[in-house]
């Protein structure tokens, strides 16, 4: 039907004592589905109940289509759910900076942050840091033009398939 949803019974059944983390893509890649606040809350509650850490990959968050509401996991109203998560973001998708190898993560729980810092080894690409700074500082106008352009590409593909290959279904990413 072109709509993506979670099979909640299967989801919870997979949370065994051997499950320690959930990698949550929001927006989901490759479907483009944007999880609702209600779904994110349910995911967060189930992960808390089963002592599963949420690793929220939100690197595609800038590509949400007009009219679609994207809810960052770290913005959920339950502090315990948010504290049980680490969010990953970056500009590699938004500004085509994948070669810069630069991204970042954050979490709100000081104990978890200290644990990550103690066990995580990282190094920064100095050119990547400069590229990210430039994108954040000067990229808004370019990006404001990109979203309508991408949206028109979705419409172009949808119209083409409808006309030339009507038996092929197409669902626009959210």
Segments from the language model and where they lie:
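Short, well-ordered beta-to-alpha junction loops that form the rim of enzyme active sites
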Residues: 27, 58-59, 173-174
């Amino acid at each position: 039907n072109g709509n993506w949803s979670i099979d909640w019974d299967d989801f919870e059944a997979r949370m065994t004592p051997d499950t320690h983390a959930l990698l949550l893509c929001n927006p989901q890649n490759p479907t483009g589905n944007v999880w609702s606040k209600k779904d994110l809350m349910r995911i967060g509650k189930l992960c808390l109940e089963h002592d599963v850490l949420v690793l929220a990959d939100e690197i595609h968050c800038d590509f949400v289509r007009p009219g679609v509401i994207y809810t960052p996991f770290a913005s959920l109203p339950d502090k315990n759910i948010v504290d049980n998560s680490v969010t990953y973001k970056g500009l590699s998708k938004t500004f085509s900076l994948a070669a810069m190898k630069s991204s970042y993560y954050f979490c709100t729980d000081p104990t978890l942050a200290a644990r990550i810092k103690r066990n995580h080894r990282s190094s920064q690409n100095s050119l990547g840091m400069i590229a990210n700074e430039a994108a954040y500082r000067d990229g808004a106008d370019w990006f404001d033009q990109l979203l309508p352009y991408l949206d028109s590409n979705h419409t172009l593909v949808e119209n083409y398939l409808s006309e030339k290959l009507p038996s092929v279904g197409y669902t626009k990413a959210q």
